[in-house]
C-alpha cells in the first residue's frame, strides 16, 4: 500500500481545521488511525526522560494521565534513542506500554507496534506510536511513508511547543531563542475547570502579583503554586515552602523572619527566616488562614514595604519576595468573623485562584487514576497496572471528599490489595479493591421488551445487518477497520455481508 497525495492532503487539512492545539492533535491521531487501519494510536510529548500523552485514539482514557518514564518502558526508550522508524516484531521480548490498555482487548498482548520519533531540528520533542492486534498489521507501509507521517506530526507538535514557549516567555517571534521545551509542573486534567485554571496560571505567572489560592483540602493547591513559580521570571531562584498550620506560635515569627544569636533561649546562632531564603524568589505560605492576628500584622508590613526584622535585631533587611498563599478556608468569612485582617486579605488576593474539587472535574478522575497507577507500577516494579471497566465506573461515581489526595491513597491501597490476590507482576484493579463507603452506581437502563414479529433466524439476520451498517458508518465504510471493531475476520465479514444483501 502507498499513501496517495489525497491521503496526505487530508491529514494536513485536518491539522488546520482544529481549534487549538489539543483539537489539532486529536484530529491528527484519529485520522492516522483511520488511514493506517490500526487499533490504537497516540501522540506523545517528550520531556525530562518521559513521554507524556497529548492525544490518543483506541486506548483507555486513563492513558492520557499516565507519564511513561523511559526507565520503565524499554520500547519507548528504544523509540527515544532511534533517529528513524522503529518496528517491533510480534515476538519482541520488550513489553508494550499499552498492553491491557486497549478497550475490549484487555487480556490480549499488543502484537504489532511502530514507533516514530519526532524531532525539531536535532531535539527529540515527542513520538507517534501505532499499535495493532495483528502481527503483520503495518507490513504494508514502507518506512518512507511512515517518515512522511512523522514529518507532519513533528511539524504540528513543534509549532505548538514553540507557541507555548513564546507565550510563557512573553516574547515576540523575532526575539525567540532556539527551540527549547518549556519545563512545567504537570497539572493533569482536561475538564473545563482545570482548563480555565491553567489559563489563569499562565496569565498571572508572568507578573509579580501576590496570589491567593483557595480550594478544599487535597485539591492540589501546592501544585498550583509550583506551576506559577516555574512559569514565572523567578523560576531560576528558589520556591520556599512554609506550612502555617504546623507553626507553633512560639517559633512562628522566627520561622518567617529569622533571628539573631541570643534573641531567646536556644538561639545559639544567627538564623535566616523563610523570607530571606526566598529572596528574589517565591514564598509559598500554605494554610495562611492559620496565622495569628499578631503575625498577620507583621506579614502585612513585609508585603507593604518589602523589609523584615529578624527576632532580636533592630536592623531591617530588604527582601524581594513574591508571596503565594493558600487556604482551605473562606477568608472573606474569616474577615467578617474577625479572625483574619481585611487589609492582609486584600494584599494577598490581588489575583485569586480557585482550585476545583475533584467531584466537579468529570473524567479528570480517570486521567489522575492512570497517573497514580503508573506511579505504583514503577514504584513496585510491576509490568502493568490497569483499571477494569468496573473500577473506572466506581471512580467516576464516587464523591471523593478528600479530593485528589484521597484518590492517590485509594489507588495505592488498591494496587497493594490486588497484588496480594494474584501471582505475577501484572495487576488489574477491580471495583472490590476499593473501600469507598456508600457508593451508589446508576442502575443499568431497562431495555424495552420488543414485540416479536419475526422468527429467530430473521431477527438474528436483521440484528447482524444493522450492526454491520452501524460499524461501517463509524469506520467510513472501511471493511478492515469494521472487521476489527466487530472482532471478526475480514474475509468472514465480506461473506456475511453478501449473504445479508449488504454487498453484491
UniProtKB/Swiss-Prot annotation:
Amino-acid positions noted as binding ATP in the UniProt annotation, renumbered to this chain: 215-222, 278-287
Pfam family membership, one: Sigma54_activat
Domain Sigma-54 factor interaction: 187-416
Keywords: ATP-binding, DNA-binding, Nucleotide-binding, Phosphoprotein, Transcription, Transcription regulation
Ranges in coiled-coil conformation: none
Pathway in which this enzyme or protein is active: Nitrogen metabolism; nitric oxide reduction
CDD domains in alphabetical order: AAA (cd00009)
InterPro entries found in the cross-reference section: AAA+_ATPase, GAF, GAF-like_dom_sf, Homeodomain-like_sf, NorR, P-loop_NTPase, Sigma_54_int, Sigma_54_int_dom_ATP-bd_1
Chain residues forming the annotated DNA-binding region: 479-498
This protein's record includes keyword Nucleotide-binding: yes
4-aspartylphosphate modified-residue sites: 57
Domain of life the protein comes from: Bacteria
Annotated GO MF terms: ATP binding; ATP hydrolysis activity; DNA binding; DNA-binding transcription factor activity
Biological function: Required for the expression of anaerobic nitric oxide (NO) reductase, acts as a transcriptional activator for at least the norVW operon. Activation also requires sigma-54.
HAMAP family named in the record: NorR
Name of this chain's protein: Anaerobic nitric oxide reductase transcription regulator NorR
Taxonomic path: Bacteria, Pseudomonadati, Pseudomonadota, Gammaproteobacteria, Enterobacterales
Amino acid at each position: 500500500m502507498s499513501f496517495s497525495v489525497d491521503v496526505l492532503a487530508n491529514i494536513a487539512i485536518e491539522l488546520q481545521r482544529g481549534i487549538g492545539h489539543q483539537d489539532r492533535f486529536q484530529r491528527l491521531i484519529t485520522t492516522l488511525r483511520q488511514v493506517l487501519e490500526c487499533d490504537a494510536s497516540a501522540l506523545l510529548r517528550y520531556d525530562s526522560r518521559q513521554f507524556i500523552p497529548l492525544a490518543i485514539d483506541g486506548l483507555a482514557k486513563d492513558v492520557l494521565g499516565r507519564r511513561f518514564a523511559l526507565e520503565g518502558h524499554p520500547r519507548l526508550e528504544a523509540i527515544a534513542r532511534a533517529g528513524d522508524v522503529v518496528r517491533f516484531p510480534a515476538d519482541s521480548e520488550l513489553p508494550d506500554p499499552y498492553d491491557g490498555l486497549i478497550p475490549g482487548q484487555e487480556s490480549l498482548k499488543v502484537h504489532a507496534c511502530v514507533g516514530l520519533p519526532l524531532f525539531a531540528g536535532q531535539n527529540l520533542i515527542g513520538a507517534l506510536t501505532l499499535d495493532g492486534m495483528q502481527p503483520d498489521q503495518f507490513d504494508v507501509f514502507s518506512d518512507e511513508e511512515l517518515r512522511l507521517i512523522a514529518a507532519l506530526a513533528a511539524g504540528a507538535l513543534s509549532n505548538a511547543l514553540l507557541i507555548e514557549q513564546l507565550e510563557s516567555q512573553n516574547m515576540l517571534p523575532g526575539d525567540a531563542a532556539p527551540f527549547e521545551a518549556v519545563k512545567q509542573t504537570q497539572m493533569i486534567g482536561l475538564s473545563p475547570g482545570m482548563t480555565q485554571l491553567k489559563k489563569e496560571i499562565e496569565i498571572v505567572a508572568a507578573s509579580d502579583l501576590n496570589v491567593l489560592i483557595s480550594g478544599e483540602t487535597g485539591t492540589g493547591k501546592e501544585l498550583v503554586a509550583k506551576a506559577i513559580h516555574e512559569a514565572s521570571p523567578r523560576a531560576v531562584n528558589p520556591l520556599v515552602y512554609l506550612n502555617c498550620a504546623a507553626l507553633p506560635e512560639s517559633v512562628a515569627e522566627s520561622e518567617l523572619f529569622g533571628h539573631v544569636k541570643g534573641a531567646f533561649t536556644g538561639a545559639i546562632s544567627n538564623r535566616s527566616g523563610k523570607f530571606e531564603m526566598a529572596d528574589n524568589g517565591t514564598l509559598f505560605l500554605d494554610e495562611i488562614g492559620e496565622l495569628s492576628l499578631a503575625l498577620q500584622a507583621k506579614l502585612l508590613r513585609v508585603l507593604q514595604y518589602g523589609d523584615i526584622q529578624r527576632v532580636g535585631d533592630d536592623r531591617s533587611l530588604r527582601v524581594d519576595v513574591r508571596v503565594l498563599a493558600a487556604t482551605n478556608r473562606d477568608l472573606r468569612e474569616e474577615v467578617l468573623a474577625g479572625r483574619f485582617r481585611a487589609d492582609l486579605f486584600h494584599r494577598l488576593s490581588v489575583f485569586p485562584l480557585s482550585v476545583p474539587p475533584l467531584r466537579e472535574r468529570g473524567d479528570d478522575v480517570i486521567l489522575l487514576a492512570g497517573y497514580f497507577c503508573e506511579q505504583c507500577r514503577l514504584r513496585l516494579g510491576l509490568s502493568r497496572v490497569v483499571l477494569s471497566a468496573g473500577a473506572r465506573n466506581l471512580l467516576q461515581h464516587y464523591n471523593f471528599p478528600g479530593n485528589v489526595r484521597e484518590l492517590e491513597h485509594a489507588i495505592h491501597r488498591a494496587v497493594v490489595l490486588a497484588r496480594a490476590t494474584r501471582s505475577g507482576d501484572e495487576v488489574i484493579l477491580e471495583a472490590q479493591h476499593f473501600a469507598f463507603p456508600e457508593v451508589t452506581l446508576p442502575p443499568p437502563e431497562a431495555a424495552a421488551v420488543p414485540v416479536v414479529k419475526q422468527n429467530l433466524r430473521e431477527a438474528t439476520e436483521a440484528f447482524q445487518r444493522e450492526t454491520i451498517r452501524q460499524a461501517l458508518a463509524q469506520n467510513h465504510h472501511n471493511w478492515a477497520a469494521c472487521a476489527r471493531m466487530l472482532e471478526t475476520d475480514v474475509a468472514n465479514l465480506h461473506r456475511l455481508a453478501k449473504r445479508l444483501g449488504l454487498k453484491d
